[in-house]
Each structure stands twice: as C-alpha cells, then as structure tokens.
Amino acid sequence: MGLFSSINTASTGLTAQRLRLDVIANNIANVETTRTSEGGSYRRQRVIFAPRVVSPYWK
C-alpha cells in the first residue's frame, strides 16, 4: 500500500465520520420537532455504510 492510497483511505474514513456526525447533529437539532413541512412527524435519520470495492487502476 503506497502513501497516496493510505491518504485516500484515511480521507474516506474521515468523510464517512463527518457524514455520521452531521446526521447525529441533525437528529439532535430536531429532537423536539413535532411536524415536518410535509405534515408528518420527524423521523430520525440513519447512516448506513457499505464496503466500497475498488479494482486497481492498472487492471
């Protein structure tokens, strides 16, 4: 594993964690929301991560 692929892996992990924290912050901000703009009640959001399979660029 080269330096750039290590940096890319770290960057991907940090981006995923930022998304997770953004969703948590949004859920906390809407904890007392009783009605959405569509008229229904607020439902918490979830982040679901899935593995990303990337083939090497030389193949």
Swiss-Prot record:
Family the UniProt entry places it in: Belongs to the flagella basal body rod proteins family.
Protein name, please?
Flagellar basal-body rod protein FlgC
Note the coiled coil stretches, chain numbering. Answer: none
Q: Which gene name does the record give?
A: flgC
What subunit structure does UniProt give? The basal body constitutes a major portion of the flagellar organelle and consists of four rings (L,P,S, and M) mounted on a central rod. The rod consists of about 26 subunits of FlgG in the distal portion, and FlgB, FlgC and FlgF are thought to build up the proximal portion of the rod with about 6 subunits each.
Q: Which Pfam families match?
A: Flg_bb_rod
> Where located?
Bacterial flagellum basal body
Its keywords, alphabetically, are:
Bacterial flagellum
What's a GO cellular component annotated to this UniProt protein? bacterial-type flagellum basal body
Q: Quote the InterPro entries the UniProt record gives.
A: Flag_bb_rod_N, Flagellar_basal_body_rod_CS
Q: Which superkingdom does the taxonomy of this entry point to?
A: Bacteria
The organism named in the record is: Borrelia hermsii
Keyword Lipid biosynthesis assigned = no
Q: Does the keyword Transmembrane apply?
A: no
